[in-house]
UniProtKB/Swiss-Prot annotation:
Task performed by this protein: E3 ubiquitin-protein ligase that plays a role in neuron cells differentiation. Plays a role in the establishment and maintenance of neuronal transmission and plasticity.
Main location: other
Name of the encoding gene: znrf1
Domain of life: Eukaryota
Compositional bias (Low complexity): 18-29
Keywords: Endosome, Lipoprotein, Lysosome, Membrane, Metal-binding, Myristate, Transferase, Ubl conjugation pathway, Zinc, Zinc-finger
PROSITE patterns (UniProt xref): ZF_RING_2
Phylogenetic lineage: Eukaryota, Metazoa, Chordata, Craniata, Vertebrata
GO biological process: proteasome-mediated ubiquitin-dependent protein catabolic process; protein K48-linked ubiquitination
Catalytic activity, as annotated: S-ubiquitinyl-[E2 ubiquitin-conjugating enzyme]-L-cysteine + [acceptor protein]-L-lysine = [E2 ubiquitin-conjugating enzyme]-L-cysteine + N(6)-ubiquitinyl-[acceptor protein]-L-lysine
RING-type zinc-finger residues: 152-193
Domain comment as written in the entry: The RING-type zinc finger domain is required for E3 ligase activity.
Protein name: E3 ubiquitin-protein ligase ZNRF1
Ranges where the record places region Disordered: 1-36, 61-84
Species of provenance: Xenopus tropicalis
Length: 195
C-alpha cells in the first residue's frame, strides 16, 4: 500500500529533455534581468531595471519588448539586436509578462461609463455616453412606511414601520437615503437594471 515508488530509469524532469536542476543552466550575461535566486531558481526583476530592453511601446501586446542598442555587448552579437526587434520568451520572463498584463488589458478593455458604470468598447463610447445622458432619471414617491416590509436590498437592513421610503415606478421600495445614494451612481432600479 502507499504511493507509487519512483524508478531510477524514469526522468524526474517535468518535460522530456528539460532539466529541473537550477544549476544546470547558468544565467547568461546577456539576460541582465535574471538573477540567481537560491532554491527558487532564476528570478526576474522589474522590467524597468533590464539593461538593453526598452519599455513596451503603446499598442504592443504585453510581454513584447524592443531591444535597444546594447553597448555592453560590444555592438551587435546578432542581427536581431541591432534592428530593435521584439522579444518574447527568454528576454521577457513570465513574471515580467504578469506585471505588464494588467496595464495592457486595462488600456485595451474599454471605457467605464461614469453614469451607469458599464464597460463600453472604445468605438461605442460616444454613442453610449449620449444614450446614458439622454436617459431619464427614475423618479420616485417618498413615503413613510406604515408596516414592516422586508429588507432593503441596498443596505440589507429591515424596512421597519416609520422608515422614510422611496417607491419606484416598478413598485420596489427602499430606504430613501439608500436609493438617493444608489441614484448618484446608477439610473435604474437595483432589482430591475434592464428596465
Amino acid at each position: 500500500m502507499g504511493g507509487k515508488q519512483s524508478s531510477a530509469s524514469r526522468s524526474r524532469a517535468p518535460f522530456p529533455g528539460v532539466s529541473s536542476d537550477d544549476s544546470a543552466v547558468p544565467p547568461s550575461s546577456n539576460f541582465g534581468h535574471f538573477r540567481a535566486g537560491g532554491a527558487m531558481g532564476l528570478r526576474s526583476r522589474s522590467v524597468s531595471s533590464v539593461s538593453g530592453l526598452d519599455p513596451p511601446a503603446p499598442g504592443l501586446p504585453f510581454g513584447l519588448y524592443r531591444a535597444g542598442p546594447d553597448t555592453e555587448r560590444g555592438g551587435s552579437s546578432g542581427s536581431e539586436d541591432s534592428r530593435g526587434d521584439l522579444y518574447l520568451g527568454s528576454r521577457a520572463s513570465l513574471a515580467d509578462t504578469l506585471q505588464i498584463a494588467p496595464r495592457w488589458i486595462g488600456a485595451h478593455s474599454g471605457f467605464r461609463c461614469p453614469i451607469c458604470s458599464k464597460s463600453v468598447a472604445p468605438d461605442e463610447m460616444e454613442m453610449h455616453f449620449i444614450m446614458c445622458l439622454s436617459k431619464p432619471r427614475l423618479s420616485y414617491n417618498d413615503d413613510v412606511l406604515t408596516r414592516d416590509a422586508g429588507e432593503c436590498v441596498i443596505c440589507l437592513e429591515e424596512l421597519s414601520q416609520g422608515d422614510t421610503i422611496a417607491r419606484l415606478p416598478c413598485l420596489c421600495i427602499y430606504h430613501k437615503s439608500c436609493i438617493d445614494s444608489w441614484f448618484e451612481v446608477n439610473r435604474c432600479c437595483p432589482e430591475h437594471p434592464s428596465d
